[in-house]
Regions:
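Gly/Ser/Thr-enriched, mixed-charge loops and adjacent short helices
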Residues: 1-110
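Glycine-rich phosphate-binding loop
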Residues: 104-134, 182, 188-192, 196
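Gly/Ser/Thr-rich loops at beta-strand to alpha-helix junctions
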Residues: 49-55, 124-126, 174-177
Length: 196
């Protein structure tokens, strides 16, 4: 710790400032295919960072794209490396999302259902989604999400009149073969890489 404190004092280590976060948010939003004005109607999102670091960035991005209602799963909003409310904080595992699913159910019973349960892993580089499915909530797998995003992004470009024949999408060797079908449908090249 002495070396760390000395490095901070000497200016060799510095904290990332709000300006860096703002530039990051701008870069993320530049990738958006749709503005809030184009959206059919506002959605209600329940979010959990699973006791990790995602709350600030995710809530800012969702707010800036016009999500009018964002609520957070209680007890999972602040970073806590002991993960007291979810033993295994993987957003693709149902057990990790159970507190969020329970809150979705209770709000649905009150007549205020959420449209989407969104979760990020503790370092906010993986995402999980659960959607209402009758009386239950279904998790969208990583493969399903990738295919949905690929189809959505390609479809938006086609709707704007873009020629996709010169585009290349990249996925991994473990991703669903449906990626090939989406690429063939829209006429762009798909390349596969090793994982990691």
């Amino acid at each position: 710790i002495d070396d760390y404190q000395q490095a901070c004092f000497d200016g060799r280590i510095s904290w990332i400032g709000e300006d860096t976060l703002a530039r990051f948010m701008d870069a993320v939003l530049e990738q958006s295919q749709e503005t809030p004005e184009e959206s059919a109607e506002p959605i209600r999102v329940l979010y959990t960072p699973l006791c990790g670091t995602g709350l600030e960035c995710v809530s800012q991005v969702l707010g800036r794209i016009g999500i009018p209602y964002l609520d957070v799963v209680p007890g999972q909003d602040q970073p806590d490396g002991d993960f007291p409310t979810c033993e295994y904080p993987n957003p693709e595992e149902r057990a990790a999302l159970q507190a969020g699913i329970d809150k979705c159910r209770s709000w649905k019973e009150m007549g205020k259902p959420f449209d989407l349960l969104l979760a990020t892993d503790p370092d906010a580089d993986r995402v999980g989604v659960a959607c209402e499915d009758g009386d239950d909530y279904t998790l969208v797998t990583g493969n399903e999400m990738g295919i949905l995003l690929m189809d959505y992004l390609a479809g938006r470009r086609v709707a704007r009149g873009e020629d996709l024949s010169r585009l290349v999408a990249v996925t991994t060797i473990v991703s669903s073969a449906m990626c090939d079908d989406v690429a063939a449908h829209y006429g762009f090249e798909l390349r596969r890489t090793l994982t990691g």
